[in-house]
């Protein structure tokens, strides 16, 4: 039963991150969230075509 809730929580978290990424689109270069003793950091690295 606990694993069912854990799986649902992971799916919800992934959908939230995916939705946020789609909303900000091209302007996302770095996202940093700090809460208590944890830090979550996502960095988008790319090379633009010239």
Swiss-Prot record:
Pfam name, any one: HOK_GEF
Recorded superkingdom: Bacteria
GO cellular component: plasma membrane
Listed transmembrane segments: 5-25
Predominant cellular place of this UniProt entry's protein: membrane
Annotated compartments: Cell inner membrane
Membrane-related topology note: Single-pass membrane protein
Signal sequence segment: none
InterPro entries, A to Z: Hok/gef_toxin (IPR000021)
Keywords, ordered alphabetically: Cell inner membrane, Cell membrane, Membrane, Toxin-antitoxin system, Transmembrane, Transmembrane helix
Function: Toxic component of a type I toxin-antitoxin (TA) system. When overexpressed kills cells within minutes; causes collapse of the transmembrane potential and arrest of respiration. Its toxic effect is probably neutralized by an antisense antitoxin Sok RNA.
Family (UniProt): Belongs to the Hok/Gef family.
Name of the protein in its database record: Putative protein HokG
Originating organism: Escherichia coli O157:H7
